[in-house]
Amino acid sequence: MAKIIGGVTSSHIPAVGNAIANNLTQEPYWKRFFDGYAPAKAWLQEKKPDVVIVVYNDHGLNFFLDKMPTFALGCADTYHNDDEGWALKPVAPFKGDAAFSWHIAESLVEQKFDICTCQEMKVDHGFVNPIRALYGTHDVWPVTTIPLAVNTVQHPVPTAARCLELGKALRTAVESYPADLNVVIFGTGGLSHQLQGERAGLIDVEFDLECMERIANDPEWMTQFSNSEIMRRAGTEGIETIMWLVMRGALQSNVKVVHKHYHAPISNTGAGVLVLENYL
Amino acid sequence: MTWTTHDYENIPGTYVFDGKHSYGAYPLNKLLFSFNTEECRTEFDADPAAYCDKFGVEGKYKEFVLKKDFLGMLRAGANIYFMAKMAIPRGTSVQDAGAQFQGITTKEFQAKLLAKGDGLVERLAKRGGYWNG
Ligand SMILES: [Fe+2]
């Protein structure tokens, strides 16, 4: 049977992709941020998951505002990156696993998560950059990936509580799949940041650290907050942090914290890396 | 038409992108979304006014686009991620835009951001459990 061995979080901002593409990762501005990825990369090298499910939000490459699914699952064998108007060079296509995706979709719907299924799905920087930061850039990616998109762009967006519930359903879905696959979940985006309005540039280090620690050890804590409260504290784009809860919900209630790394600022954001491992 | 109100509406300097914004600025966001492709970016540059007309972007929306008034566009309902597709290829980074929103220089905006990291290493050491170089 498939099993979830752990979860990893990462920022997904375009600047991360640009820093990698332009070989800036050892420049003074970036060094501490990227050096803190080394233990996460080493953990992935050691565990060698067969499949990574990447929880991210699309920022207007695949989804326009004509149709905006709250949760959408890639159900294809290939996912393409493309020009998204952010001056990022597109990367090589990603290999998916359609049969596994369809199993997950079926199980989620059975569990009352009526997810949107996508047989064609372009993946943007939100999906690409965590993979690049954690695996390096490749012409042939070293792992099979499944995109799970959460709407954090157009409100109403799902609550933190709902995201945690989705994660729990995702665990049931993965662990009922008959193939022997080791799976890791990536929770991407965040932490606090606001790009828009006169309040742009907001970073709340205290809230970020509290989120990291609670998501690792007490994720229910996050579910007390409404999305308004999260945005007030962490900024409008900081709402992305809810996607970490999908990852967290898919793990056991007690997990081993393998690695915890925080850096601010990276571009306009606070950035956190967590590596959480399920006990066998 | 009666739009419901939300408690996020009183967050200062913040324009939460919700149904009300998305509904009102639909043509504008459709125009911004088109900038995913180089062809459309080039077509816009050749004749911005005609490009607005093609998308039905009129009145104040058109004015903001032609003036590249990003704060105006935002207040009128542009989505920040879609707006970035217009700004970034034309040399306005998200930090330049942030500085414009606040009426300060990009250097000042970046200095404010960098200050958020002051004392971070000591702070993480004190909390414990964090990788610290
Ligand atoms: Fe994002």
Functional labels for PLM-detected ranges:
Chain B
Residues M1-G133:
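Charged, low-complexity intrinsically disordered segments
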